[in-house]
Amino acid sequence: MKKLIIYILPLVLLASCAKNLDEYNIDQKNPKTVSAGSLFGNALKQLVDNQTTPSVNINVLRFWMQQWTATTYQDEPRYNITTRNIPLAYWTPFYREVLQDLKESRRLTDEDESLDAAVKNNRIAVTEITAVYTWSVLVNTWGDVPYTEALTDVNQPKYDDAASIYADLFTRLDAAIAQITPGSNFGGSDLLYNDDTAAWLKFAHSLKMKLAITLADVDAATAQAAITTSASQGFTSNADNAAFAYLNTTPNNNPISANLNPVYTSRQDYVAGETLVTLMNTVNDPRRPFYFTAVNGAYLGGRIGVNNDYASYSKPSDRIIQPDFEALLMDYSEVEFILAEAAARWGIAGTPETHYNAAITASITYWGGTGAQALAYLAQPQVAYATAAGTYKQKIGMQKYIALYNRGYDAWVEWRRLDYPALRPAAEAESVIPLRLTYPTSERTLNRSNVESAATAIGGDEVGTKIFWDVF
């Protein structure tokens, strides 16, 4: 692997007011002028961009989760990840832009003797929360990854055990939670919560529960304890969502718009996926007009892995392709689904049905539906927790899959973990639906020994190899 040293990359336009981006006058030839806040804001934007973009060169997880499919070019819906070198394209921004900028921001914060102690602690805390989120994505995508020797002068960093990384992430997150106090952090450079450190504290507790439930099948004790301590301190409404606000103008528009909005592109590469649309049609889901466009009054999804006529199928909705459409790192609906599962598994945090209903209602109202529509939806026997088919994993898994629309990464994690819905591989698939990304080819070239050791440790560097928490 290329030596992971700190590069000061050209910075994106960053924020100067509530969830807005504006120009910073940065002398890109003189890294000493770059502030800790600029680096933090840049790291946040790069993280969200990487998770949000639908570019087939970087992030194809909406295809894999059959939320969308392609009209013409079927390599990615059929799980070809080598033609465009997707593992490298997805891996690189996390290390080179996000984590390195966070590390440098932390260094500058530590060295700034003019900072008030409480502000310094808050800056360190929100930097750590963002880093923990990023590291969890790396582990959930690849398994063992460079961690303890990453971002150092080590030319060929070792790959750390994924479960051990997770354990350390809990330690880091707990430390961040403990040091947050009311007050400022990065001011306008906090592009996620606009300097609302109390909101970051809720996000930290919600993230802790997210990591915990991911471990539920392999370390129930840790998972239960973490959720028990954070259950009452996470998100309690959609107002708490970790939502990143984009702008109407480039380069700060949502990357979805760059790939789908006719103002920015003439390409017509994406249509709704048959799997999700059919499931939503079956239960008359009120979110359909917010998720997709209609075709002659109906919602129609294209087949996965075959060519689809653009005009014949539903497309991502006009709302989703707007340049200022916000991106979610985590939301209240997800927290309620976590609590529903914790209640079903361990009898903690209330009843499964109460949290299940709250999760679905939160999703419907977030997208623009009404409370009355949510009640009607939940009253259907195939949706109601008491009568829906299957175990708690199936009940929650099916509804969480719908709620995680447009969040391909999160839907992919939950599908692997809960095993619902039972997705079928694409037509003419090149492999199983991937359970992980393979290591980038550059890693095999530059860090071969460590990559090979990691591949052996995880059971093979293959897309069908399960991440350590995926045991069923």
Question: Where are these predicted regions, by residue range?
Answer:
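Generic surface-pattern signal
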Residues: 10, 14, 45-52, 70, ...
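Residue-level detector of short coil/turn "hinge" positions at structural boundaries
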Residues: 58-62, 288, 350, 403, ...
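Bacterial Sec-dependent N-terminal signal peptides
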Residues: 1-26
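Structured, solvent-exposed acidic/aromatic patches
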Residues: 33-37, 71-371, 386-393, 399
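Membrane-proximal, proline-rich intrinsically disordered regions
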Residues: 17-67, 71, 77, 96, ...
